[in-house]
Amino acid sequence: NIGRLAAISSGLPVHVPGMSVDRQCASGLMAIAIGAKQIACKEMDIVVGGGVESISLVQNEFSNKYKSQDKLLMKNKPDIYMSMIDTAEVVANRYNISREKQDEYALQSQQRTYNAQNNGYFNDEIIPVKTTKVLKNIESNQTFYEEVEITKDECNRPSTDIEGLSNLKPVMGENSFI
């Protein structure tokens, strides 16, 4: 239970509960929404919400195999374990969302993130976290460790442009959208 481990690791006493929300995408957002609801319903006064996301290992060929798949479900509903990429393809097809529209939305998202970070919109909501970053020199195969302080989401790309997005190849092959 990563939520419980995080609570204890942060120095909270053992009587403070922790829980995990398992979603392959948006678990952090869901954890925050659950916490906000607990406060709104006056069930809790203080809640810490966060997430641990890793969508790099949910595609079928790289799937984490430690989670079992129910054979009866697989027989009766074979798409029950559909990956997020496959799900996105279904949504894009069903609602006729073109590659161009997806690229425009992705660009807008990158720009909004950059703007919000640049203007400090989330500074009061994000607590800096000190951690150790592992770096690997590809040429020498040497591994280095660096103490860092994470103060914002590091994954946005402010230099993103529509041309760069349109040049990205679809993950599932040429006939796909995503």
Segments (PLM) and residue ranges:
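Short acidic, glycine/serine/threonine-rich loops at helix termini
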Residues: 1, 57-63, 140-142
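Conserved catalytic cysteine-centered active-site region
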Residues: 1-45, 79-86, 158-178
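Active-site-proximal alpha-helical scaffold in enzymes
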Residues: 5, 23-52, 92-122
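Proline- and acidic/polar-enriched loop/turn elements at helix boundaries
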Residues: 19, 51, 59, 104, ...
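A short, structure-level motif marking secondary-structure boundaries and short turns
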Residues: 20-21, 72-74, 98
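Acidic side chains
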Residues: 22, 45, 70, 86-89, ...
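Flexible glycine-/small-residue-enriched beta->alpha junction loops
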Residues: 36, 41, 45-94
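N-terminal extracellular/periplasmic Venus flytrap/periplasmic-binding protein-like
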Residues: 101-178
